[in-house]
Curated annotation (Swiss-Prot):
Keywords: ATP synthesis, ATP-binding, Cell membrane, Hydrogen ion transport, Ion transport, Membrane, Nucleotide-binding, Translocase, Transport. The gene is atpA. It comes from the Archaea. It catalyses: ATP + H2O + 4 H(+)(in) = ADP + phosphate + 5 H(+)(out). It comes from Nanoarchaeum equitans (strain Kin4-M). GO terms for molecular function: ATP binding; proton-transporting ATP synthase activity, rotational mechanism; proton-transporting ATPase activity, rotational mechanism. Its EC number is 7.1.2.2. The keyword Cell division does not apply. PANTHER family: H(+)-TRANSPORTING TWO-SECTOR ATPASE, V-TYPE PROTON ATPASE CATALYTIC SUBUNIT A. The keyword Repeat does not apply. This is A-type ATP synthase subunit A.
Length: 570
């Protein structure tokens, strides 16, 4: 019989026979744990629940299985803890606002009936990853995938209403159900990785144009406390051009998950017109939950993302915040007595981060569909210090840095993305898309960067000698810098017209700002800049972002006329 011989917080040492990464039940309360190390007949067990009250000598029960998640209908519009247990079902069963220790509930609802429509017929040969049929889940076509380890001839296939436990087909004598299980630490197989080809449109202008990533790409959002990481992550979750959104609250405040739960059902998806919650999966592993489960929640989100990617959908996984997960790794590592690396983090921090971020990508699935998994990870460096290990190791793995700046946040510049230090490595991939549809945008974007850089340099001079010391040829950069910052880069998350900026609106806004800039440059030397400013055209451009699409188009025409009149006045 396996017995506990030592307890150190979430780390339990037991004597007996175990397999590495096996899920075990610890103590009389049968707490969920995972074997993370074996030494002779001793096993080091990471316990995913509170170990208060656990005693030395209590039994440890083997399950013989790794940590797995059930994948099938019922995942969407649901909220799970870090181990994939549905929080709503836990509350209905226990009437407790806390998760009781040792509770064992399946991820998917066993009673709900789904209408299964077969896409294959009796006698067809199928293999792992093939789509055998579909189920309608809140208007979403949930494609039922053959488990990757199954192949052969379909002996029987049924149509009709089934619970997820009932057999829908028989292949080589094996029953196929609406769901299958998959180990969360094991990436799901695919045929090949494909090149990026299409930008990941978020509805946030500064991300879509200045620092875009491709569908299947990855980005890090580091920033100090109060700089707007969570609001930006929620904005991406709300409006991203993605079929499925998985939002992982990893070690963050419970109120943030509550906000998402309250807001998303009220908001409509711009593509389908249905509540946003219908395409969203929430994984809540808040700061007061056991820290060991933070690691599980990150892999859980990636596995669910890969499952929908394998159905040919585009998926985005939002992890807020990976720093809390790294802190959990640091705590477990120190309890194991491992030699610490920089700032006390384990030496394998980079490998662990890579295991997560490398699961992103655009792939050809086993059933020859194209799917993508985009990963966006928030990082919370203490004091906003980007040189700390989690931020530095993350930047080695991701395709873009969206750096949040508390100075911009205090100036009420939202999203507070520092446009001088942020970057994207994926511009070359998405550039082709813009070249085909909006060729002029590439040049305008470069000009915007040049103006903002020059404005920043001149602001240092202005802070010492004042703006009057500058010539009009220099003042134009301050004038245009303000228009770009306030009229284009800034975005109001709480304004119904400005919260989500369709790409068409973003491009038109860029063009009108650029048109105004070219006109003012032509007039410099003929009219003083002060006189041009008095016309007030720039104020109208700045306010454009608050207009609805219909008003926006009308206002653009009026501003174009004013710019033309200004040019013809000379």
């Amino acid at each position: 019989m396996n017995r506990i011989i030592s307890i150190n917080g979430p780390l339990v040492i037991a004597k007996g026979k175990f397999s590495i990464f096996e899920v075990v039940r610890v103590g009389e309360e049968k707490l969920i744990g995972e074997v993370i190390g074996i030494e002779n007949d001793k096993a080091y067990i990471q316990v995913y629940e509170d170990t208060n009250g656990l005693k030395v000598g209590e039994p440890v029960f083997n399950t013989g299985k790794p940590l797995t998640i059930e994948l099938g209908p019922g995942l969407l519009a649901n909220i799970f803890d870090g181990l994939g247990r549905p929080l709503k079902d836990i509350y209905e069963k226990t009437q407790s606002i806390y998760i009781p220790k040792g509770i064992d509930l399946p991820t998917l609802d066993r009673k709900k009936v789904w209408e299964f429509i077969p896409k294959k017929k009796k006698g067809d040969t199928i293999k792992g990853g093939d789509i055998i049929g579909t189920v309608n889940e809140n208007g979403f076509e949930h494609r039922i995938i053959v488990p990757p380890n199954v192949e052969g001839k379909i002996e029987e296939i049924y149509e009709g209403n089934f619970t997820i436990e009932e057999t829908i087909a028989i292949v080589n004598g094996k029953p196929i159900k609406l769901y299958h299980e998959w180990p969360i630490r094991k990436p799901r197989p695919y045929k090949e990785k494909l090149d990026y080809n299409y930008p990941f449109i978020t509805g946030t202008r500064v991300l879509d144009i200045m620092f875009p990533i491709a569908k299947g790409g990855s980005a890090a959002v580091p920033g100090p406390f109060g700089s707007g990481k969570t609001v930006l992550n929620q904005q991406i979750a709300k409006w991203a051009d993605s079929d499925i959104v998985i939002y992982i609250g990893c070690g963050e405040r419970g109120n943030e998950m509550t906000e998402v739960l309250e807001e998303f059902p009220k908001l409509k998806d711009p593509k389908t017109g249905k509540p946003l919650m219908y395409r969203t999966i929430l994984i809540a592993n808040t700061s007061n939950m056991p820290i060991a489960a933070r690691e599980a929640s990150i892999y859980l989100g990636a596995t669910i993302g890969e499952y929908f990617r394998d159905q040919g959908y585009s998926v985005v996984v939002n992890a807020d915040s990976t720093s809390r997960w790294a802190e959990a790794l640091r705590e477990i590592s120190s309890r194991l007595g491992e030699i610490p690396s920089e700032e006390g983090y384990p030496a394998y921090l980079l490998r662990k981060l890579a295991e997560f971020y490398e699961r992103s990508g655009r792939v050809r699935t086993l059933n020859d569909l194209e799917g993508s998994l985009t990963i966006i990870g928030a990082v919370s460096p203490p004091g906003g210090d980007f040189s700390e290990p989690v931020t530095q190791n993350t930047l080695r793995l991701v395709g873009a840095l969206w750096a949040l700046d508390s100075k911009l946040a205090y100036k009420r510049h939202y999203p507070a993305i520092n446009y001088l230090i942020s970057y994207t490595k994926q511009w070359e991939f998405v550039k082709k898309y813009f070249e085909e549809l909006y060729e002029d945008v590439i040049e305008i974007r470069e000009e915007f960067f040049a103006i903002l850089k020059r404005e920043s340099e001149l602001m240092d001079i202005v802070s010492i000698v004042g703006p009057d010391a500058l010539s009009d040829n220099e003042k134009i950069y301050l004038h245009m810098g303000r228009i770009i910052r306030e009229g284009f880069l800034q975005q109001d998350a709480f304004d119904e017209n400005d919260s989500y900026s369709p790409l068409e609106k973003t491009i038109e806004l860029m063009r009108i700002i650029h048109k105004y800039y070219v006109t003012v440059k032509q007039l410099l030397g003929k009219i003083p800049l002060e006189e041009i400013e008095q016309k007030g055209i720039h104020e109208k451009i700045i306010k454009l972002r608050y207009k609805s699409l219909k008003e926006f188009r009308e206002e653009i025409k009026a501003i174009e006329q004013e710019i033309l009149s200004l040019l013809n006045s000379q």
